Amino acid sequence: MGAGTERAQRFAAEDFARYSATVKAAAEDGTAMLFAGTAMELLGASVTDRDGDTYPGIGLASFTTVQGKRRIVGDVYGVTAVVGFMNKCGQIRGVEAPLLTGLSLGFGNEAEKGPEGFHWKNVFASELTGPVLVKNPRLLEAVADAICTRRGISLPEERPSFPYAEAGYAITAEQLKLRAEARQ
């Protein structure tokens, strides 16, 4: 599930709530899922919008989101060499199992350089916007491995190479790493 505006998110939450039991059961059973951008916020217990109105998430996890009036926009470079772009106005509190343990550059769930995202079983969630998998070969491999493992197969030893995607990742990662080091 991908990102959307905060305004559209409330409508999506109402519709998504109809599937909460199905999504929770699939997650418990090990189905691989990816949530990017504001879609991640819907996995928690609740979202409080900038006007102070609260609406429920699906409750896959107990974290909560509080949206503010200040937008957080910028590049992200994870300690585990994940790259991406973030455009959000929410702080996510109480994530017990983050996808990324820390950031060298950018804003995490609650604070700058803090842990970012959510990971439970085969549910991968990040407030990074797409193309998350194309930009992050290691994350793509983790998601593909989760899909294959659930089906009882292994990723093939020899996989196709995508030199342009790999070069794009390497250039982006190197530039963001240099920017993060310059800020220290």
Predicted feature descriptions by range:
Residues A13-F16, V47-D51, V73-G74, E141-A142:
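Short, glycine/charged-enriched secondary-structure capping and boundary segments
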